C-alpha cells in the first residue's frame, strides 16, 4: 500500500468509505420505490412542481434528493422501459455532490446523469450536460429529453448548425445538452456581442461533463479560438513550402519529437538565407520570414495526412487526436493550417487574427459546481484534484467483471507486429468470435483493412472518414463473425452488445417503415398518457424487438461460448486511459471478453519513451522481426513508460496553467466591465472617473521632482485641452498656478472644468436628439473591443518570446506576470483615453450604432494545435469577476491582481498605488 493509500485509509477517505456513504443515500432512494410506483402518470409529473416549491421554500437539494431521485427513476421506467440499477443511483449522487464518477463501460452513464440533472434543474437556474460531439449531444438530448419532458422539465440541445435565437432558447431550458466546443465558443461569442439580448448563455451554475477525462485532461492544453480574417497575403506560405520541399532531414533540419518541435540546422539556415536573399535570417526584420519557414517545416515534417488531418473536397480538416473524429470548421492557429494547405496544394486561406480565446480549463472552472463521468479517471485523480478540485469515486459495477486482459505482445518491428495482428484476426475470426481492432489513426486503420481484405476476412472500418455510419457499425460489432477496425472514436458513448443490439435493430426497422424519430422515442416507453399513433408504434416496436431479440439472444449465447468480444490494440497510447478505454469495450455488464495489445519497438511511445529499458532486453534475447515476446514484466515496463509520459504531460499542463492564470484575470476584468456596459447601467459616473484619472496621470507625468508640478508645460496643457478641457482652460489659471504647491489644488480645479465641459456636451448632444447614455455605451464598447483584441495578440507575442528569459537565469512565468501587468495597464490607459477623447471631442450628428466586436458570420472557430501558437489561457472562477464599475479594466484594491499571482491587488502590483 502506498503512503497516499495508507493516509486515505487512516483518515476514512478511501474509495470504499466513499462508496459506503453513497450506498447509504442510495438505500434511502430505493426505499421509496413502491411509493412512486403507486402514482399515476399525472401524479408523478406533478411531483416536479411540488419539489420546486420545496426548493423555493428553503429546503436544500440534499434534503429533496431521495424523493427526487425516486420519482425520476420511476419516470425512466415509464418512458424508457429501464429500471435504474443501484450503482446508477450511486453514480448520480456522486455527480450531484460535484465529483467525478468513474463508471465502467456499459454501466449506463447516460441515464445516470439524468438523476442529478433533474434534481438540480429544480432550482430553475439551468443545468448543462456536456458531451464530446454533436452526435452524442443530439442523441442523448432527444433520448433523455423524453423522460425530462414527461416530468415537466424542458430540454434544449446545442449543435453546430443552430442560429443565435435557437441557441438562446436552448440555454433558456432547464437542462441543456451540448458539446464542450459549442459551449466554450458560445461563451466567447457572448463576450463579443454589442447588445445584451444577443447573448445566448445565462450563466454557469451546474455542469455534468461526459467523458470528463477527454475534455478536462486531454484537451486542457488546447485553447478555443475565435478569429477574424487577416489582411496578409498567402503568397509567402507557398514560397516557404517550395523552399522547405527541397530540405533534407538531419542535414537541413532536425526534429525533437518529444517536444514536437522542428529547427533549421546551420546548413538549413544558410540555404534559407541564400534562397530568400537575406543576410541574417535571425534578424528581427526577418522574424516573419523565419516564422513562415518553420511553419512550413512543421507541416512537412510533423503533420501527417490521414493521421493529424485529412483532405476532403479540397479542404484540410483536422482529426481530433483523442477521439479520431473530424473537426469540421476548426483550424490550426498561427499559420500552421495555411502551411498544411500549401503542402497539400489546396487553396491557402488567409491567416486569421485572434479575436477571443479560452481553454476548457478556464471555461469549466467558471461553473459554481462541476462534475463528470468516465470509465477511466482514477489514474488522473491528482490532476483533477489539483486543477479542478474534483475527487474521483470508483463506482462498483452492477455485475462482477470477468474480462481477461492478456499481457502485451512485443515485436521488434512494425512489420512483424502487423503480420502477427493479421494472423490473430484470421485465427479468431475462423471461430466466429467478434473482434474489435483499435488503431491510433486513419492511416493505420486503412492499412490494416487492406491486409485483412487480402486474407479474405469481411470487416467494417470505422474512422474519421466514415463516421456517419458509426451507430450502424458499433451496434453490430458484438455479433458472431464481426470484425471491426476502428480508431479512438469507436465506443465513446456507445455500447457493444454481444450478439447484436435488438433495440437498435427494431428502431432502424421502424425508421425504414417511415416512422419519425419522435414517434419512435415515445413508442419505446411505458407511460400511458400518449396519443393513439404512439400506442400503435409501440405495438410495432414490441413486435420488432421480440423478433430481433430471439435472433440476438441466440447469437449472444454463441458469442458468450466463444469468449465474448476480443479486443486487439495495435499500439499503446501515451496515456493509459486511452488504452483502458479500448479495453473497456469488452466485458460490459458481466459479459466475458478479452483484450491484448500488440506492440513494436518502432511504435512512437516505445521509440520515444520506452527504449532505454525495454530495447536492451529485446537485444539480449536476440529476437527476430517476427518473434514475439510476451511477459508480465514487459507490460509493467511499458506502463512505467506511460506513467512517465503522463507525468511529463501533467507538468506541461501545470506550466501552461500558470500562464493561463495571468491572461484569465485580465479577461475577467475586461469581460466583467463589458457585461456591465451591456446591461445598460448608467456609465456617466464611470466616464467622470476616467476623466479624473486622465488628469491625475498627466499630473504625475509632469512632476518636477522638487515637490511641485509644472502645469505650464505645453505638452500637458495641449494634451488635456485636446482631451477633456476647453481651449484656454489653463490660461485662466495662470496666476494661481504660480502659488500652488500641491498638485491636488490644480487637479481639483480641472475636475470642475472638465465636468462642466461634459455637462455642456450633454446638453448640446441631447438637443440633437442623441441619447447620451447610449452614446457613452457605444464609445466605451468600441474602445474596449478594439484594444482588447490588440492586447490578445500582444500577449501571444510576449508568451512566445518569454521562454528565452530562462537563459538569463530569470523565471519566465514571473517575468510574464510583470510584463503582462504593464501591458494591461497600458491597454487600460488607451481605453480610457480613446473613450474620453471621443465623448468630449468627436463631432456627432446622429447616434452611432454599436459596432459589432466582430461579425460572427465571418469568423472562424479553431484551436491552437501542436505547432500552432498557444493562445493565452487561464483560470476562470465565478467569484473573481469585478463588481467595481468605476472605470473599464480598473482594479479595485481588494480584487485579485491581474498579474495572476493570486494575491489582492493592494498586496501585489498595486502596493503603494
Annotate each predicted stretch with a short phrase.
Residues 887-906, 910:
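Short Cys/His-rich zinc-binding micro-motifs
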Residues 6, 380, 481-482, 666, ...:
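Generic detector of short, well-ordered, non-transmembrane alpha-helical segments enriched
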Residues 1-600, 604-622, 671-672, 688, ...:
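Conserved P-loop NTPase motor core
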Residues 432-445, 679-680, 734-739, 898:
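Short, Lys/Glu-rich amphipathic helical modules
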Residues 66, 197, 223, 434, ...:
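Proline-rich intrinsically disordered, low-complexity coils
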Residues 14, 440, 495, 501-502, ...:
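Compositionally biased, intrinsically disordered low-complexity regions
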Residues 437, 485, 788, 824, ...:
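Hydrophobic, well-ordered secondary-structure elements that form the walls
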Residues 36, 309-317, 323-330, 560, ...:
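Extended, charged helical/alpha-beta scaffold domains that provide interaction surfaces
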